[in-house]
């Protein structure tokens, strides 16, 4: 899984 994906969801 890409950590960047999680960060983007958190920012949203």
UniProtKB/Swiss-Prot annotation:
Keywords on this record?
Amidation, Amphibian defense peptide, Antimicrobial, Secreted
Principal place of residence: secreted
Residues bearing Lysine amide?
A: 12
List, in alphabetical order, the GO biological process terms annotated in this UniProt record: defense response
**Tissue and organ distribution:** Expressed by the skin glands.
Subcellular location(s) of the protein? Secreted
Does the keyword Cell membrane belong to this entry?
Answer: no
User: Do the record's keywords include Secreted?
Assistant: yes
Q: Which GO terms describe its cellular component?
A: extracellular region
Protein task: Has antimicrobial activity.
Protein family (similarity comment): Belongs to the frog skin active peptide (FSAP) family. Hyposin subfamily.
Record-given protein name: Hyposin-J1
């Amino acid at each position: 899984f890409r950590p960047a994906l999680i960060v983007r969801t958190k920012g949203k």
